[in-house]
């Protein structure tokens, strides 16, 4: 099978710092693939390595089966969209999108036709004569995407492109990006530190930590079956039981993750514990409770909010509660390297 992008034991060193440390991944053609991780985890460096903006310290990269480690950026079948859209303020939107084609020597009539077509793909064909200052943040983002698409890349690289947008616009752009990727059928590689973005748009997600990949999986499997304590804590919220806590509370050997929404309050169950509510956080669709169990352990519990229901007086800070859960919702974890 020929992959869109393949890393074979790739490393990138800055002095003694291993920004990317022995990463191997295979990204499929036509896949929406996200690289998720905290700042400094290596995800953006990997994107820059694909684009050719960084040089490898070790390993190899191939793009559609062709060795790409030593290719200059302009010879790689990829284009990049950055968080800073870098639009030319004095140019029309049409000329902004057509700029790369002008540099390549494409004649004006042809490049304007291609730029207009790219704008149509992102539903902005009507703004071609405007200036960037006349557009909203979301529209400028789509212009930046059109400018990348006009070169007809087989892989589109997106480096935290939604980070500058407000929450509602960011959520709207997530839907639009996914629809665009599906309609184009090309590979999108999306870098983000936002788990919500990665889970909502991606076919698969690679979770980065300290220059390495902790897990590559579908969004559902990442959430429901995290493999390491880091993934369990970074993708969503988890209660992580180390060996001592698992043995004490559950009679089980090893480390486990338990999602807060899988714990029931004041309802008997297979495994039970008692504790005191320390804090209550109303979060709209759910309420989160921070508990201190009688043995001193801390536990997070999330309870869905039913329409019109008030929080019972028995579920306020200082109140004693019983919690329960089942063994089958506890996810075994492997120790981090």
UniProtKB/Swiss-Prot annotation:
Cellular component GO terms held in the UniProt record: ATP-binding cassette (ABC) transporter complex, substrate-binding subunit-containing; membrane
InterPro entries listed in its UniProt record: AAA+_ATPase, ABC_SmlMolc_Importer, ABC_transporter-like_ATP-bd, ABC_transporter-like_CS, Mo/tungstate-bd_C_term_dom, P-loop_NTPase, Transp-assoc_OB_typ2
Keyword Transport: yes
Domain ABC transporter: 5-235
PROSITE patterns on file: ABC_TRANSPORTER_1 (PS00211), ABC_TRANSPORTER_2 (PS50893)
Classification via Pfam families: ABC_tran, TOBE_2
Residue positions binding ATP: 37-44
Molecular-function GO term, any one: transmembrane transporter activity
Keyword set includes tRNA-binding: no
Superkingdom of the source species: Bacteria
SUPFAM superfamilies: MOP-like, P-loop containing nucleoside triphosphate hydrolases
Record note on disruption phenotype: Inactivation of the gene does not significantly affect natural transformation.
Keywords assigned by UniProt, alphabetized: ATP-binding, Nucleotide-binding, Transport
One of the GO biological process terms: transmembrane transport
The family this protein is said to belong to: Belongs to the ABC transporter superfamily.
Function: Probably part of the ABC transporter complex YdcSTUV. Probably responsible for energy coupling to the transport system.
Designated name of the protein: Uncharacterized ABC transporter ATP-binding protein YdcT
Source organism of this protein record: Escherichia coli (strain K12)
Gene: ydcT
């Amino acid at each position: 099978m020929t992959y869109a992008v393949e890393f074979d034991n790739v490393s990138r060193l800055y002095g003694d710092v291993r920004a990317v440390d022995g990463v191997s991944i295979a990204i499929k053609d036509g896949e929406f693939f996200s690289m998720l991780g905290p700042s400094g985890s290596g995800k953006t460096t990997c994107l820059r390595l694909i684009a050719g903006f960084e040089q490898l310290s070790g390993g190899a990269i191939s793009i559609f089966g062709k060795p790409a480690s030593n290719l200059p950026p302009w010879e790689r079948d990829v284009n990049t969209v950055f968080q800073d859209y870098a639009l030319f303020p004095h140019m029309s939107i049409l000329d902004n999108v057509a700029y790369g084609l002008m540099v390549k020597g494409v004649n004006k009539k042809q490049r304007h036709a291609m730029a207009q077509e790219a704008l149509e793909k992102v539903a902005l064909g009507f703004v071609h004569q405007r200036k960037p200052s006349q557009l909203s943040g979301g529209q400028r983002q789509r212009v930046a995407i059109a400018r990348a698409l006009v070169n007809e890349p087989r892989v589109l690289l997106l480096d935290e492109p939604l980070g500058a947008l407000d929450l509602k616009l960011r959520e709207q752009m997530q839907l639009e990006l996914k629809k665009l990727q599906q309609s184009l059928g090309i590979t999108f590689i999306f870098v983000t530190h936002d788990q919500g973005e990665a889970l909502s748009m991606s076919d698969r997600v690679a979770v980065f930590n300290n220059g390495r990949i902790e897990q590559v999986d579908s969004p559902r499997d990442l959430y429901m079956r995290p493999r390491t304590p880091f993934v369990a804590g970074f993708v969503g919220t988890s209660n992580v039981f180390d060996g001592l806590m698992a043995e004490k509370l559950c009679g089980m050997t090893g480390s486990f993750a338990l999602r807060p929404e899988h714990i029931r309050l004041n309802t008997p169950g297979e495994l039970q514990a008692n504790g005191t509510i320390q804090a209550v956080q109303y979060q709209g669709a759910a309420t989160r409770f921070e508990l201190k169990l009688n043995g001193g352990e801390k536990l997070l519990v999330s309870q869905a909010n039913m329409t019109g229901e008030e929080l019972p007086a028995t579920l306020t800070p200082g109140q004693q509660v019983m919690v329960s859960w089942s063994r089958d919702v506890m996810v075994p974890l492997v120790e981090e390297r």
